[in-house]
Swiss-Prot record:
Belongs to the UbiC family. One of its GO terms (molecular function) is chorismate lyase activity. GO terms for cellular component: cytosol. InterPro entries: Chorismate--pyruvate_lyase, Chorismate_lyase_/UTRA_dom_sf. This is Probable chorismate pyruvate-lyase. Pathway: Cofactor biosynthesis; ubiquinone biosynthesis. The keyword NADP does not apply.
């Protein structure tokens, strides 16, 4: 079954958020008073065959992976997973190793010589391995189960010096900036259940 498509099936403001080009981190930062990155894991991990195929490296079994939660005013809103071949994480993409809690966007949109493929979109169903992976990571990081059985997601491949980097972003929060006013003058988000830091 094909998961990823060129078609963005979301509606309204959520569709605009999921389909927006440019830096998602910058867009999130503009939606609240404080934007932050929580690193969940970083290092060598087994890859899904679909990830390896998206990288054009179908035989790749293990890659360098960075997983984070993107937060707005302390509320977790997006799960992001970045994947590249291990040698590339020591070469063209070595800067991702030292990001710490800085967003990957600092590298992707702040430097020259990086190309990006068009966005692909998916609605991750609760029975899918990707949904289960995100749900497990989300619960471990926030202490809260995912409220949505279907998760809007997008991905694209960034290439630098012939080295591909796959970036997937899952819009996992049921109430998030795509339902708020996207302006820095907003005093704060509506009342939401607080998650663990």
């Amino acid at each position: 079954m094909k998961v990823w498509s060129k078609r963005n099936v979301q509606r309204g403001n959520r569709k605009r958020w999921v389909g927006a080009t440019g830096s998602l981190s910058a867009r999130l930062a503009a939606a609240g008073q404080r934007f932050s990155v929580q690193v969940l894991s970083q290092g060598l991990q087994a890859l899904d065959p679909d990830e390896a195929s998206a990288l054009g490296l179908s035989r790749l079994k293990v890659g360098y992976v960075r997983e984070v939660l993107l937060r707005v005013d302390e509320v977790a809103v997006v799960f992001a997973r970045s994947v590249t071949a291990h040698p590339h994480s020591q070469g063209p993409w070595r800067s991702i190793r030292g990001l710490g809690t800085r967003p990957l966007a600092d590298v992707l949109f702040g430097q020259h010589g990086i190309a990006r493929t068009p966005l692909q979109f998916a609605s991750l169903q609760v029975a899918s391995s990707l949904h289960r992976h995100v749900a497990h990571a989300w619960l471990g990081a926030t202490g809260a189960a995912l409220a949505s059985r279907v998760l809007p997601a997008r991905r694209s491949v960034f290439t630098r010096g012939a080295a591909p980097l796959l970036v997937m972003e899952v819009f996992a929060a049921p109430h998030a900036p795509w339902g708020w006013l996207t302006t820095k003058t907003r005093r704060g988000p509506p009342a939401l259940p607080r998650t663990k830091p």
